[in-house]
């Protein structure tokens, strides 16, 4: 994806406080690299919180283009909406390197142009799950 592309995330930020309903946030790809020029990640303006990490980052066509991962420390860097997502292409390589076989279905990018964004969110929220750990 290119810098300036519109993207959105879905997840369960701070589920213990904000509840267990899936949340939607949107923004843009601010840069095609992260801290120190790390090309494995996108810098995104999508607001993410603890609990969004590991959730999907979608393009406006409904394709998963990344997985939300982190943000700059707001107190230390005095920054807002400087967050990161691991690019989907690097996740595919990681999954293929796993010792257990993971079958990945190749697919062509889709365009869900006829569905409204609210309809797409309703469709995708069934695939975004909350995982709790002890």
Q: What function would you assign to each model-found segment?
A:
Residues 39-44, 94:
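Small beta-barrel nucleic-acid-binding modules, principally OB-folds
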Residues 12, 34, 63, 96-100:
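Sec-exported extracytoplasmic/periplasmic mature domains
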Residues 1-40, 48-52, 68-79:
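Flexible, gly/ser-rich surface segments that form the specificity/activation loops bordering the active-site cleft
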């Amino acid at each position: 994806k290119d810098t300036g592309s519109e993207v959105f995330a879905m997840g369960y930020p701070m589920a213990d406080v904000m509840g267990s309903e899936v949340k939607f946030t949107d923004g843009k790809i601010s840069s095609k690299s992260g801290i120190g020029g790390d090309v494995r990640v996108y810098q995104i303006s999508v607001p993410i919180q603890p609990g969004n990490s590991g959730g999907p980052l979608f393009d406006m066509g409904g394709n998963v283009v990344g997985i939300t991962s982190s943000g700059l420390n707001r107190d230390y860097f005095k920054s807002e909406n400087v967050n990161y997502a691991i690019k989907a292409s690097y996740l595919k390589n990681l999954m293929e390197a796993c010792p257990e076989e993971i079958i990945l279905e190749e697919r062509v990018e889709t365009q869900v142009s006829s569905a409204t964004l609210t309809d797409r969110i309703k469709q995708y929220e069934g695939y975004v799950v909350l995982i709790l750990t002890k």
